[in-house]
């Protein structure tokens, strides 16, 4: 396969059709097209509107708790004996993950568009909680679609959503996971186009969602860049984040894409291994196709039917990936690697024991890769990792596996 030509900037996309190279675009039902174009129009106005930016920054500071800290993991660094490890502490945000950054941005857009009802899809429940949270903050009704399997394994987040006033609709189709929840949300949206805003939680879906979600999440990388320059006087040698749909990863990656000396690694869910179907490594083991309104790498069979992936982490359990990640992989700017369930589980325990931080299973995948790479790097080198969510929601899953349940 011919390598695409290196662009002048890795940060210029998407083009006016929402494409990153051959990926992205907007493949939607005819009934949704006017709404998508309206959304794009509003987004183009909002992102250049100083009033919108000011409101976003104010809510970021006083509601989310930004900037999130940059934390030097001293004991983990000493234990591994190599590169210095810094965490961007997104798990300290209101609601416990990076998801709120995007939700605040999108609900402000929904208000601008005069929408009176919010729908969302969720896997781990973190995006559902963040959507229910902003809907409560702005007084809008909210319906969250969640795969029945995920409802079961993420019970604390289901309860949180209900407490916040959201209606949680379990989806039993397919394997009852994130893909199926997204399908149901899209069906709802087609039926209720006038009143409803679909608050997509990851950097996927039809244009302008991948760009919009990335821009709302890029605050992570922008802050981390400034914070690391203040702490170390230079940029990191390596940036690492877990990738499901890819919003936390693109948020920390994007501001570093044009910095030549910075290597970037996205960590996919390797599940129980890549030889079978029980994983969610769309880039490592998938092929290009169209799902949920955009062209990207997918887990699909020879007939183009979407496979049901598996990950110990509900938030990485998606058979696709954001189109910008697909492009960054093909152009060679970002390296994507799989981490298995058992490796993520070990990393989860390591961080808890050494730093007193209980991470979510999603960033535990990124951490497992950091644990592999840090000892092979020099002590003068720096790794920046996005600690995208806290592990409260996962303690029962982990407890069950480790035989530590009640």
Curated annotation (Swiss-Prot):
* Signal peptide as annotated in the record: none
PTM N6-(pyridoxal phosphate)lysine: at which residues? 99
Q: Which InterPro entries match?
A: Trp_synth_b_CS, Trp_synth_beta, Trp_synth_beta/beta-like, TrpB-like_PALP, TrpB-like_PALP_sf
Please provide one cellular component term from the Gene Ontology annotations of this protein: cytoplasm
Q: In which pathway does it act?
A: Amino-acid biosynthesis; L-tryptophan biosynthesis; L-tryptophan from chorismate: step 5/5
GO molecular function annotation = tryptophan synthase activity
PROSITE patterns with a match to the protein in the record? TRP_SYNTHASE_BETA
Keyword set, alphabetical order: Amino-acid biosynthesis, Aromatic amino acid biosynthesis, Lyase, Pyridoxal phosphate, Tryptophan biosynthesis
* EC category: lyase
Cofactor(s) the protein needs: pyridoxal 5'-phosphate
- Look up the EC number in the record and give it: 4.2.1.20
Chemical reaction(s) catalysed: (1S,2R)-1-C-(indol-3-yl)glycerol 3-phosphate + L-serine = D-glyceraldehyde 3-phosphate + L-tryptophan + H2O
> Which Gene3D superfamilies does this chain map to?
3.40.50.1100
Highest taxon above the source species: Bacteria
Describe the function of this protein.
Answer: The beta subunit is responsible for the synthesis of L-tryptophan from indole and L-serine.
Please state which protein family the record places this protein in.
Belongs to the TrpB family.
Q: How does it assemble?
A: Tetramer of two alpha and two beta chains.
The record's NCBIfam families line, in alphabetical order, gives: trpB
Please give the name of this protein: Tryptophan synthase beta chain
Species this protein is from: Sinorhizobium fredii (strain NBRC 101917 / NGR234)
The organism's taxonomy opens as:
Bacteria, Pseudomonadati, Pseudomonadota, Alphaproteobacteria, Hyphomicrobiales
């Amino acid at each position: 396969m011919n390598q695409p030509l290196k662009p002048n900037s890795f940060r210029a996309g998407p083009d006016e059709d929402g494409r990153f190279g051959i990926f992205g675009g907007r493949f939607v039902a005819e009934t949704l097209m006017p709404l998508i174009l309206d959304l794009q129009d509003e987004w183009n106005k909002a992102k250049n509107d100083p009033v919108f930016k000011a409101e976003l920054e104010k809510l970021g500071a006083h509601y989310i708790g930004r900037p999130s800290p940059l934390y030097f993991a001293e004991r983990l660094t000493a234990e591994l004996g190599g590169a210095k490890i810094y965490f961007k502490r997104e798990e300290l945000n209101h609601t416990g993950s990076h998801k709120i950054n995007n939700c605040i941005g999108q609900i402000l857009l929904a208000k601008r568009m005069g929408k009176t009802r919010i729908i969302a899809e969720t896997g781990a429940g973190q995006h559902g909680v963040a959507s229910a949270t902003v809907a409560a903050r702005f007084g809008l009704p909210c319906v969250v679609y969640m795969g029945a399997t995920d409802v079961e394994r993420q019970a604390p987040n289901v309860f949180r959503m209900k407490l916040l006033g959201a209606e949680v609709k379990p989806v039993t189709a397919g394997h009852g996971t994130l893909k199926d929840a997204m399908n149901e949300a899209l069906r709802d949206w087609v039926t209720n186009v006038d009143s409803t805003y679909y608050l997509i939680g990851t950097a996927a879906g039809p244009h302008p969602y991948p760009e919009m979600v990335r821009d709302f999440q890029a605050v992570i990388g922008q802050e981390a860049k400034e914070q690391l320059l203040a702490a170390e006087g230079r940029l990191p040698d390596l940036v690492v984040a877990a990738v499901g749909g890819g919003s936390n990863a693109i948020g920390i990656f994007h501001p570093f894409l044009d910095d030549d000396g910075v290597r970037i690694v996205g960590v996919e869910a390797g599940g129980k291994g890549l030889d079978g179907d029980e994983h969610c490594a769309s880039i490592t083991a998938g092929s290009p196709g169209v799902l949920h309104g955009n062209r990207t790498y997918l887990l699909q069979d020879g007939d183009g039917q979407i496979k049901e992936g598996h990950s110990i982490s509900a938030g990485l359990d998606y058979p696709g990936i954001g189109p910008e990640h697909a492009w960054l992989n093909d152009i060679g700017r970002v390296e994507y690697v799989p981490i298995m369930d058992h490796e993520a589980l070990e990393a989860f325990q390591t961080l808890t024991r050494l730093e007193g931080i209980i991470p979510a299973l999603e960033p535990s995948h990124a951490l497992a890769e950091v644990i592999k790479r840090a000892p092979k790097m020099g002590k003068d080198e720096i790794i920046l990792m996005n600690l995208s969510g806290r592990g409260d929601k996962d303690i029962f899953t982990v407890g069950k596996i480790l035989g530590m349940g009640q």
